[in-house]
Amino acid sequence: MASNMDREMILADFQACTGIENIDEAITLLEQNNWDLVAAINGVIPQENGILQSDFGGETMPGPTFDPASPPAPAPAPSSSAFRPVMPSRQIVERQPRMLDFRVEYRDRNVDVVLEDSCTVGEIKQILENELQIPVPKMLLKGWKTGDVEDSTVLKSLHLPKNNSLYVLTPDLPPPSSSSHAGALQESLNQNFMLIITHREVQREYNLNFSGSSTVQEVKRNVYDLTSIPVRHQLWEGWPASATDDSMCLAESGLSYPCHRLTVGRRTSPVQTREQSEEQSTVVHMVSDSDGDDFEDASEFGVVDGEVFGMASSTMRKSPMMPENAENEGDALLQFTAEFSSRYGDCHPVFFIGSLEAAFQEAFYVKARDRKLLAIYLHHDESVLTNVFCSQMLCAESIVSYLSQNFITWAWDLTKDANRARFLTMCNRHFGSVIAQTIRTQKTDQFPLFLIIMGKRSSNEVLNVIQGNTTVDELMMRLMAAMEIFSAQQQEDIKDEDEREARENVKREQDEAYRLSLEADRAKREAHEREMAEQFRLEQIRKEQEEEREAIRLSLEQALPPEPEEENAEPVSKLRIRTPSGEFLERRFLASNKLQIVFDFVASKGFPWDEFKLLSTFPRRDVTQLDPNKSLLEVNLFPQETLFLLAKE
């Protein structure tokens, strides 16, 4: 299998020989032939033109080598290439199945899968199902350069390179804990990531600190400042598969914490790679006339002479620790950290990347248990003590460890007058004019300085100003002495904070109990008011019904015909009616009166006939069921009768 450099050269020669300008199509044809250039050309060029044999194969025929004593070989025709026809009797080697390597990332796991390109996407998912214990229907396999693909898609049809990075999403499966995930993400946003970035061309490492809220794009822009490689020409290795978007925060990109290694280089064109290979080779290759045009267009790939020579010269001179008049303090500290690492090695304090105000927030404006001291390192390149202080004291493992555990370390370079004036302004604003004057009057040979700051309720107190003419033991003793003062103050702050939280908890509990009591009283009062309103409504309905019944009773009573005398010329019927209470109602009616008059009489006494019924004994019958328009004589209620009133069911 050809190396990456050989593949670039094979790709360029294949396009030159076949005239195929589409790079994707050319790569596909080469991969189908396992990057066998001769086999790929034979598959495109008709067989009558002869079978080609390449100098890349293991069975190459001896070609002319460069010999200073020998006369130069005649130049070939413009259409000639680095290949020469041989007899058709060359036996083509049987093509081996092409294997594809996949690295699949799922949460905190990486699974390596190796399959033939004749397999399908679904077979990858089946392997992942056994490894990750995730059902295939619940699994989304992402990271394909062509977009989403079906499970039945054959890998060969995707024209994939040999090494591929994919990742698995499971939107239908609940995460381990959404709240814990959100908490972990918030914690990652507040963390600082150390990126160890290797510049491939110059074999130089940069140690850069970034906050979790920084984006991938910001990292690439900062690397451009250090390496002079524009972002569009940067070729990266080491980013996690999930870091697919330059706008993604580092906390979400899947970087290893606290350190992550990356490699960056300059993206080169296939033509440049081939020309470099030809310069190193002792075999004379005949190239086509079009290569000259390709060389003239090499600037399209970002190769500028000034950049190349500037890169070489930058490694020879000493770069400043911090740019002058930097607009952003975070960017200035990124360069400071990178330059500090390049001068004194990777073992150094973790410098906080951000403004001085942000360092205050990180150190002081948190819970009392989480507070730390703030150490401000003031650098000066022109001091004779700087190199010794940085290399032997500040980078000592004991000092680095102690600072990392107990301090937030912030740095600034006072070499340039503009940066010095800027820091004195910050110092005057945050620490007062006394400290600013102390730093202003320091001589160059007294630098570097190490300021130990402790946050208090109303102001920030400078506990100690350590000059560069010290030793590791003395520096450690002064750091520990500052830590003792801070620890005593921290314990008081923790006690005050706990007492304040206890008081606030009691107050919250009392407020909650009072609120619940008010709600209970209000609910009780509202229930009583509803009950009284309901009783009033029912009483009103009852009164209205009684008034209505009384009005009906009076109207019926007034409408009754007068009671006839016992001695009357017309026949008289005497009725005796027993009420449910046992009382008797007696009245005389004319035998010719209708039965309705009897009903009206009973209703006028408070027994409406729609609620009560009249029963006779012999024969037993319900009189209210009879025709009310018939006379008493017709219904046999003559000359006298006893009736009973019963309430209807």
Swiss-Prot record:
Query: Where does it live in the cell?
Result: Nucleus
Q: In the record, which positions carry Phosphoserine?
A: S319, S581
Query: What GO molecular-function term can you cite, just one?
Result: protein kinase binding
This protein's gene is called: Faf1
Show where the UBA domain sits.
Answer: 1-57
Q: Which Pfam families does this entry report, sorted A to Z?
A: FAF1 (PF21021), UBA_4 (PF14555), UBX (PF00789)
The record, for SUPFAM superfamilies, names:
Thioredoxin-like, Ubiquitin-like
Start and end residues of each UBX domain: 568-645
Q: Where is this region: Disordered?
A: 55-84
Q: Which residues carry this modification: Phosphothreonine?
A: T579
Q: Which UniProt keywords apply?
A: Apoptosis, Nucleus, Phosphoprotein
Q: In which tissues is it expressed?
A: Central nervous system.
Q: Which Gene3D superfamilies match?
A: DNA helicase RuvA subunit, C-terminal domain (1.10.8.10), Glutaredoxin (3.40.30.10), Phosphatidylinositol 3-kinase Catalytic Subunit, Chain A, domain 1 (3.10.20.90)
Q: State the organism named in the record.
A: Rattus norvegicus
Q: Which residues form a coiled coil?
A: none
GO terms for CC?
Answer: cytoplasm; cytosol; endoplasmic reticulum; nuclear envelope; nucleus; ooplasm; perinuclear region of cytoplasm; VCP-NPL4-UFD1 AAA ATPase complex
Q: Subunit structure, briefly?
A: Interacts with CDT1 and ATPase VCP/p97. Interacts (via UBA domain) with FAS (via death domain). Interacts (via UBA domain) with NLRP12 (via DAPIN/PYRIN domain).
What the protein does comes down to: Ubiquitin-binding protein. Required for the progression of DNA replication forks by targeting DNA replication licensing factor CDT1 for degradation. Potentiates but cannot initiate FAS-induced apoptosis.
Q: Name one GO biological process term.
A: positive regulation of extrinsic apoptotic signaling pathway via death domain receptors
Q: What is this protein called?
A: FAS-associated factor 1
